[in-house]
């Protein structure tokens, strides 16, 4: 298993992003909150071949938002302008004191890794870490998002330096193709992840990256946390691009786009590059409050994890009970949630490993279907769980253990790449021991 720790946190407000993602945690005491043996879980020592690493995302650390021919991405527009996309047209304008992000923060400079990449790699080496997961900026490589419109040589040069620099320092690169920063032109021209056109666009972009970097990169991730960037950016509208009500359509297209990129690698590059490629999914662990709540907790897991994991790892189809609940709720585009036989065959087994991001655990109970309980479950957090640095994050190590067992049992996955840690709230770096 591989664990990634963030090297540099979000340049844009982490508090704002995670308040939108998690919501202010609902704290409620319950008998299940108190289990001393469980809560003081100690997993023992890590195996000798365990790989320690750090992870970043291009928009969160690079800066250089207009440097050397880079195109705008949806986060550039979301942070620089106040407004949202309607019918694929961005109605944003100069913020005039109103912003989509707390404090009108942007990632124009961020951690300045576009300039300071050597310093960052030296830090990773000095920490004794063995791997570095970073993402490529689609708009830095393809300013309009389209291969047909030409590529940006400066962007290719930057990532060549980063990859070669990592390898020269004995650091194994894990490269993510998409970490939420869609080229703005693809959003404005056809609606980004709400359109089937994104499938071919993403596959062509992936092909470009495999061709230019795959001679040295042997570990690829297609999409990072699709449930987060879709649910927050295309349903609630609180993240880029600020679209509302398009959740299930956009979710559907992420699976098809991922599978298309995987098949490009499988058919054109695997034999000569000998790498591996997969998708990274994000989920909380959902613990039932009582035995009567187990079905509700399972529904949460199937909606947040199984929505992608079952088609990819089990049978090429969505969980039927999840689709039924979505239709019962009357959600828009629920009718789109099915695959043709050809699509199903493309999706099934389209990941060489189970990529997992996990930060949080919750207690789940059932509730009657209503406007405030659309899917039959609700969740809360225990006030006695240890508080981490961010206000929304609590330390629940046994939740990760339960989650890993769930993945092993339900998806028969032996190979898990995992991202997640708990910070104590300090920016200091402490020496070992």
Regions found by a protein language model. Give the residues of each.
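Cleavable N-terminal signal peptides of Sec/SRP-targeted secreted and luminal proteins
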Residues: 1-14
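Generic anion/oxyanion-binding catalytic loop in active/binding sites
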Residues: 3, 106, 113, 148, ...
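Active-site region of glycoside hydrolase catalytic domains
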Residues: 12-101, 125, 144-146, 153-433
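Active-site mouth loops of central-metabolism enzymes
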Residues: 102-116, 194-196
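Internal amphipathic alpha-helical repeat/solenoid segments
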Residues: 109-122, 143-146, 151, 155
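Short, well-structured secondary-structure segments
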Residues: 130-137, 172-176
């Amino acid at each position: 298993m591989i664990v990634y720790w963030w090297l540099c946190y979000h340049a844009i407000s982490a508090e704002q992003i995670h308040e939108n993602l998690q919501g202010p945690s609902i704290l409620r005491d319950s008998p299940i909150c108190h289990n001393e043996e469980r809560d003081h879980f100690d997993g023992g020592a890590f195996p000798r071949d365990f790989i320690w690493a750090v992870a970043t995302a291009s928009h969160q650390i690079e800066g250089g938002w207009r440097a050397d021919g880079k195109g705008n991405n949806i986060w550039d527009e979301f942070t620089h302008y106040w407004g949202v996309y309607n019918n694929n047209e961005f109605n944003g304008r100069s913020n005039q004191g109103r912003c989509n992000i707390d404090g009108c923060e942007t990632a124009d400079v961020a951690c300045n890794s576009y300039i300071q990449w050597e310093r960052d790699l030296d830090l990773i080496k000095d920490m004794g870490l063995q791997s570095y997961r970073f993402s490529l900026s689609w708009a830095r490589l393809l300013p309009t998002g389209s291969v047909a419109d030409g590529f940006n040589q400066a962007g290719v040069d930057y990532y060549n330096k980063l990859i070669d620099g990592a390898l020269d320092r004995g650091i194994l690169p894990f490269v993510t193709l998409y970490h939420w920063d869609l080229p703005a032109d693809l959003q404005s021209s056809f609606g980004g992840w709400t359109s089937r056109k994104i499938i071919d666009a993403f596959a062509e972009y992936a092909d470009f990256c495999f061709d230019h970097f795959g001679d040295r990169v042997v570990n690829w991730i297609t999409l990072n946390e699709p449930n987060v960037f879709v649910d927050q950016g295309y349903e609630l509208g609180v993240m880029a691009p600020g679209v509302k009500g398009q959740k299930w359509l956009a979710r559907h297209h992420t699976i098809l786009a991922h599978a298309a990129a995987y098949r490009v690698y499988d058919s054109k590059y695997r034999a000569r590059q000998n790498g591996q490629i997969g998708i990274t999914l994000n989920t909380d662990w959902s613990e039932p409050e009582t035995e009567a709540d187990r079905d509700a907790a399972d529904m949460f897991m199937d909606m947040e994890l199984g929505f992608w994991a079952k088609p990819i790892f089990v049978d090429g189809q969505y969980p039927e009970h999840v689709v039924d609940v979505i239709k019962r709720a009357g959600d828009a585009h629920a009718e789109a949630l099915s695959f043709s036989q050809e699509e199903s065959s493309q999706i099934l087994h389209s990941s060489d490993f189970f990529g997992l991001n996990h930060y949080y655990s919750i207690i789940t109970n059932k509730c009657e279907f209503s406007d405030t309980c659309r899917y039959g479950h609700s969740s809360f957090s225990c006030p006695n769980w240890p508080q981490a640095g961010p206000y929304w994050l609590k330390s629940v190590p046994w939740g990760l253990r339960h989650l890993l067992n769930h993945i092993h049992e339900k998806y028969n996955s032996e190979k898990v790449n995992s991202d997640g840690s708990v910070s104590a709230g300090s920016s200091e770096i402490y020496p070992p021991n």
